[in-house]
Swiss-Prot record:
Region (G2): 567-571
Annotated segments matching region G3: 592-595
Residues covered by region (Disordered): 39-347, 400-452
Positions of the UniProt region annotated as G4: 646-649
Region (G1): 542-549
Name listed for the protein in its UniProt record: Translation initiation factor IF-2
Location of the region described as G5 in the Swiss-Prot/TrEMBL record: 682-684
Functional summary from the UniProt entry: One of the essential components for the initiation of protein synthesis. Protects formylmethionyl-tRNA from spontaneous hydrolysis and promotes its binding to the 30S ribosomal subunits. Also involved in the hydrolysis of GTP during the formation of the 70S ribosomal complex.
Binding site for GTP: 542-549, 592-596, 646-649
Residue span(s) of domain tr-type G: 533-706
Molecular-function GO terms, alphabetical: GTP binding; GTPase activity; translation initiation factor activity
Gene coding for it: infB
């Protein structure tokens, strides 16, 4: 006996069996083992080998036994004696069988059949088998270690389980019918949940098994039929029928899923259907020929159900009766699919026919017409009809009987309310009306223009409207060109030109109007009879640091009443000065504009509302970029220019050089025979200021500036901001008419009543005449600087106009927030674009506008600035919340925190940056954008080495080198040049100095170099060493 010990797992390898199978054999032979690592004697091993050989010959049945015993503990040798009591093990076997069917249909079919055999035998033993074993089936879906060992039908004839073969075939037969004929598989389902899983269980294995099974299925399976007889969701099953039936059985797992779904739909449908079914059996026969493929097979299995239908002989008739109403019920959803005109009449006719239980082919033919509208909606309606058939038929009978006169139709529409939901009827009629309207609209199509003028970027929708084509047509054209666009996306001018070429429309690029150009004429025809002289509005313009504000301060200090405490605080950018000219007291209103390049829009606005432009040029600095820009603004606005050459008291001042430079821009001094007045002044010393003021008044007289003070005020918003105490505050320049406290004012989209007015000296005033600049309180919102304002007599009219303008503004803001196609399409397709979210709060609207304009100048090809909010006013807790939600940075320019905002920012961890110099703000944001850019790899040279000798080493070679310049570093990148050409690029793998490994070798030393992938060294080769370093990119590179 004890010739030697053998471990179970070694024996399993030798016999090419699983450990579990071997343990099962040990159980059968009463060999006591605990696990696969237990040892047995050689003689026991021999007996196992013999048993394994028998297994190999009859592997089907052995597998069955193995499956049965695989869940038993191997330590009990008495397990094999208990084997003949299968009923005790039934549930365990079922658990093994069901999941295998669901998952591995091909490989596990035989095992499933074996399980079925055992179920069948259990059925033979117990009189009412379906319920006891149906309940364990449902929880078994997820479990299943399935073994993918292919086995064929050879199992069935080999073991004493031969008599069980027939029940197996029977069990598979219903399954096949359940899958292939959804209408029938659903029929048996209405009632008890315990029985639903059975058809699902058996369904999948029948597909992969060989054809023989089909024959055995057909031959008869009364035993298992009852389970299939239940019918539940007819509608879904027949919907499945509409799709190709052959495709569904082909998929094992997917086919089982629909069966489960079919078990769920409304069970309430079953009862009314049964009522109609019994008498409708003959009509069902009439419909039956539509499925000629397997009539006999279907009839046989469904014939036997003991679902309370007595007699197997009546099975076929009962079956067809059950199917016939199915079909009728199924077809019920289709009538709404007919042409829209006769829907109601046809539905009622169909319901009458169901009531009479007569399946008429004519009606059926009508129903086959294709769907026009939403079939799901109609089907739901008809589901409700099916539940209420008895009541609805009585109502509709009297109406549906007459032929089809229009009167009857209208009557039926009224009384057939319970049958077809009125809401959907209304929807459909409204659809019809809409369709008719659309047709009428399309008939009045605009002709496509031959030429269009474009000033800037446009959305696809706007372009489609301009070119009189469908927006989808433009999207299609661009898609064919490789550009994916949406209807609301902005297209730039080159893209618009491309679309125009495709549509054969000439696209002209109209030059955008200069911002400084005067758009609206403030004086109307009715004012001509009432015009009076008004003070001139003078804008001081020039380059930054050329002394504009100093000049203004100097004029004010000399001309403002000396009694004012501490001089005048400049509340607003516009103020007036009283001077005596020709013995009369006259006024001049000055506007101060910033000189920094960011404030272009402000300068343009100043030029637009002004009458005379004073151009300040420093005598020591000459004409600068903003000087040129100011000249162009004034010329675009068509206002006369008076040049003040400032800083003549400084050393190095060259007034004549300034005059010379100005001639290049069309400004020639009167002294030199030109028309431009040029006055040399010193703002600090106050030299020649009176001369400058006199010249301004002289030019004003020539211009004959006039306005009508007896009308409602009109003018322009110079500046606006949000004050925490006063609310929205706007600085208005009145250009015509007179403004009173209490007037209804509309500025842009901001509407309000003038509550108070404050002049430039801080005094409250009740009346402001032409050319006056005042601060106005009482507006509902902060208007944009540069908006025109107007006073209305009718408040309702003003409100309506304000609402309309607000909508337009909102739309334009949305369009601006959208990125244009060219800047984004390529990057968006390659990868995610990086964005910097900003919330910008400034002291006044003009500052905010200037900052936004500057930020737009920063290149944004790879990183985008996304302005979530730009407004004038304090930084509030609302801003902090918005920043926290969107991950934005808050930029504050010359503004403060509202109470509680700073603490909220600290708690939320929001980054708030405060600035009072615009240069610094722009630099910081540009730096933040550069930080978002991916750093680029740049080659940094290390040194140059010459090969002096080559030493063969093994299969390769080592180069003896001399470092001529720089250094060599191990693992650096090298480039080998021979006769000026690069012959190899790679990594320096080995570096030695005097037989020792070296990390680096400096210039003037010799060393040995080895490269794994290159051995073709030659004396005189030059080795260039370099390394790749990351370098921060700048936005200039992304242009």
């Amino acid at each position: 006996m004890n010739n030697g010990k053998v471990r179970i797992y070694e024996l399993s390898k030798e016999l090419n069996l699983d450990n579990k199978e071997l343990l099962a054999i040990c159980d059968q032979l009463n060999i006591a083992v605990k696990s696969h690592s237990s040892t047995i004697s050689e003689s026991e091993a021999e007996s196992i080998r013999a048993a394994a050989e028998k297994l190999a010959a009859t592997n089907g049945t052995s597998k069955k036994e193995l499956n049965a015993t695989s869940h038993k503990p191997n330590s009990a040798p008495a397990g094999s004696r208990n084997r003949p009591a299968p009923p005790q093990k039934q549930q365990q076997i079922l658990e093994i069988r069901k999941p295998k069917i669901l998952r591995n249909t091909t490989s596990n079919a035989p095992e499933a059949s074996v399980a079925n055999n055992q179920i069948a035998s259990s059925e033979a033993n117990s009189p009412a088998p379906p319920r006891p074993f149906a309940t364990p089936v449902s929880p078994m879906k997820p479990t299943a270690p399935s073994r993918p060992v292919p086995r064929n039908l050879s199992e069935t004839p080999q073991k004493p389980a031969a008599p069980e073969a027939e029940p197996e075939a029977q069990s598979q037969a219903p399954a096949k019918i359940a899958v292939e004929k959804p209408e029938k598989s659903a029929q048996p389902r209405p009632g008890k949940p315990e029985r639903q899983p059975k058809p699902q269980l058996v369904a999948p294995p029948s597909r992969p098994t060989a054809e023989k099974l089909d024959l055995s299925e057909i031959t008869g399976a009364p035993g298992e039929k009852p389970i299939l007889k239940r019918d539940r969701p007819r509608r879904e099953d027949e919907r499945d029928q509409a799709k190709p039936r052959v495709a569904k059985p082909a998929q094992g797992e997917t086919s089982s899923a629909p069966v489960q779904k079919q078990a769920r739909p409304a069970q309430g449908l079953v009862k009314p259907e049964q009522r109609v079914n019994r008498p409708g059996a003959p009509s069902g026969d009439g419909i039956r020929p539509q499925r000629p493929v397997r009539p006999s097979a279907d009839a046989a299995p469904v014939a036997t159900p003991p679902r309370g239908v007595p007699g197997g002989g009546r099975g076929e008739a009962g079956d067809t009766a059950a199917i016939a109403p199915d079909l009728l019920d199924l077809k019920r959803p289709t009538p709404p699919r007919l042409a829209k005109g006769g829907k109601k009449w046809q539905e009622e006719e169909i319901i009458d026919e169901i009531k009479e239980k007569a399946g008429k082919a004519g009606v059926k033919g009508k129903r086959v017409k294709p769907l026009v509208e939403d079939d799901f909606e109609d089907e739901d309606l008809l589901d409700e009809e099916g539940l209420e058939i008895p009541a609805t038929v009585q109502v509709s009978l009297s109406i549906a009987r007459p032929p089809k006169p229009k009167a009857a139709r209208s009557a039926s529409a009224a009384t057939a309310a319970p049958i077809s939901s009125p809401t959907t009827r209304g929807k459909r009629s409204s659809h019809n009306n809409r369709d008719q309207n659309r047709r009428q609209e399309t008939e009045v199509k605009r002709e496509r223009p031959e030429k269009v003028a474009v000033t800037g970027a446009m959305t696809v929708q706007e372009l489609a409207d301009l070119m009189a084509v469908a927006d989808t047509e433009i999207v299609k054209i661009l898609f064919m060109k490789g550009m994916a666009v949406s209807i609301t996306q902005n297209l730039d001018i080159p893209t618009i030109t491309l679309v125009g070429k495709e549509l054969e429309i000439e696209v002209e690029t109209a030059e955008p109007e200069a911002e400084a150009r005067k758009v609206t004429e403030m004086i109307e025809v009715g004012d001509l009879e009432h015009l009076l002289r008004r003070p001139p509005v003078v804008t001081i313009m020039g380059h930054v640091d050329h002394g504009k504000t100093t000049l203004l301060d100097s004029i004010r200090k000399t001309k403002v009443a000396a009694g004012e405490a501490g001089g005048i605080t400049q509340h607003i950018g516009a103020y007036h000065v009283d001077i005596v000219h020709d013995g009369k007291e006259q006024q001049i209103v000055f506007l101060d504009t910033p000189g920094h390049e960011a404030f272009t829009a402000m300068r343009a606005r100043g030029a637009r509302v002004t009458d005379i432009a004073v151009l300040v040029v420093a005598a020591d600095d000459g004409v600068r970029p903003q000087t040129v820009e100011a000249i162009s603004h004034a010329q675009a606005a068509g206002v006369p220019i008076v040049v003040a050459i400032n800083k003549i008291d400084k050393e190095g001042a060259q007034p004549d050089r300034v005059k010379q430079e100005l001639t290049q821009y069309g400004l020639t001094s009167e002294e030199w025979g030109g028309e431009t007045i040029m006055v040399p002044v010193s703002a600090i010393r106050g030299e020649n200021l009176d001369t400058l003021l006199e010249m301004i008044l002289l030019v004003a007289e020539v211009g004959e500036l006039s306005a009508n003070p007896d009308r409602n005020a009109r003018g322009t918003v110079i500046e606006a901001h949000l004050d925490k105490a006063k609310g929205a505050v706007a600085t208005l320049l009145i250009q015509n008419g007179t403004l009173h406290v209490g007037d209804i004012l509309l500025a842009g989209s901001a509407f309000g009543k003038v509550r108070a007015m404050v002049d430039d000296r801080g005094r409250r005033v009740d009346i402001a005449g032409p050319s006056f600049a005042v601060e106005v309180l009482g507006l509902s919102d902060v208007p944009a600087a540069g908006d025109e304002f107007e006073v209305f007599d009718n408040e309702k009219e003003a409100r309506a106009l304000a609402s309309d303008r607000a909508d337009k503004q909102r739309l334009s803001r949305l369009l601006q927030g959208r990125v244009t196609l060219t800047t984004l399409s390529a990057q968006a397709q390659e990868g995610e674009l990086k964005e910097l979210n900003l919330i910008l709060k400034g002291d006044v609207q003009g500052s905010v506008e200037a900052i936004v304009g500057s930020l737009k100048q920063i290149p944004q090809n790879e990183v985008q600035i996304r302005m979530l909010l730009t407004a004038a006013g304090e930084i509030t807790e609302t801003d902090i919340d918005l920043a926290a939600a969107s991950g934005a940075v808050i930029i504050g320019f010359n503004t403060t925190f509202a109470s509680g905002a700073r603490q909220a920012a600290d708690e939320a961890g929001v980054d708030v940056r405060e600035y009072n110099i615009i240069y610094k703000l722009i630099e910081d944001i540009q730096g933040a954008l550069e930080g978002l850019l991916e750093p680029e790899l740049v080659e940094e040279p290390l040194g140059q080495t010459e090969v002096r000798a080559v030493f063969p080493v093994g299969r390769g070679a080592v180069a003896g080198c001399y470092v001529q310049s720089g250094k060599l570093v191990r693992n650096c990148k090298v480039r080998v040049r021979r006769a000026g050409k690069v012959i190899y690029e790679g990594v320096l793998d080995s570096l030695k100095r005097m037989k020792d490994d070296a990390r680096e070798v400096n210039a003037g030393y010799e060393c040995g170099i080895g490269v794994d992938k290159f051995h073709d060294w030659a004396e005189g080769d030059i080795i260039e060493s370099y390394q790749m370093v990351t370098k921060r990119r700048t936005l200039a590179l992304t242009r």
